Design a protein with these regions (language model features):
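Positively charged n-region of N-terminal signal peptides that target proteins for export
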Residues: 1-4
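N-terminal signal peptide c-region/cleavage motif recognized by signal peptidases
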Residues: 13-14
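Electrostatic cytochrome c docking/interface patches
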Residues: 19-43
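Gly/Gly-Pro-rich "capping" loops immediately C-terminal to redox-active cysteine motifs
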Residues: 29-30, 53-90, 96-110
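Extracytoplasmic/secreted proteins, especially bacterial periplasmic and envelope-associated proteins
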Residues: 35-39, 68, 76, 80, ...
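The canonical Cys-X-X-Cys-His
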Residues: 36, 44-55, 81, 127, ...
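C-terminal capping alpha-helices of c-type cytochrome domains
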Residues: 102-136
Length: 136
């Protein structure tokens, strides 16, 4: 918990509304795109496909509330993707997308999940690495 908070504070120290990104990896290393893909399609972990859709033929039921993930790597840099995952409300205060990298300052969190981020810093980096590969 303290490590995640420290990483987030370090990342946010280099983030501004003008640049709209988190340029530094939360782990200091690149993520693994294969692990990131498995997080995105896993409804028990990433929850991404509840709202998003994409080229995931193994998942017939996909969301339509949020942008299609196809071409995410062409639309946003890794730094922009990272911020969108860690704290999407930083970019859009009205978003319904959860802050996958925050554990404080949230509301309507089930008691069992209070004080926990939805994804670890490594999982976030893996998802960023995967989304960055989606160029078409």
């Amino acid at each position: 918990m303290k490590v995640l908070l420290a990483l987030l504070l370090t990342g946010f120290s280099t983030c501004s509304l003008a640049q709209q990104s988190l340029p530094n990896s939360l782990t200091g290393e690149k993520g693994d795109p294969a692990r990131g893909r498995s997080i995105v399609v896993n409804r028990q972990v990433g929850l991404c496909l509840l709202c998003h859709s994409g080229a995931f033929p193994e998942e017939p039921s996909q969301g339509d509330l949020a942008p299609d993930l196809r071409g995410a790597g062409a639309r946003w840099t890794e730094a922009q993707l990272r911020l969108r995952i860690v704290d999407p409300m930083h970019l859009n205060p009205a978003t319904i997308m959860p802050a996958y990298g925050k554990s404080e300052g949230l509301w309507r969190v089930a008691p069992a999940f209070r004080g926990q981020a939805l994804l670890t810093p490594q999982q976030i980096e893996d998802v960023v690495a995967f989304l960055a590969t989606l160029r078409d």
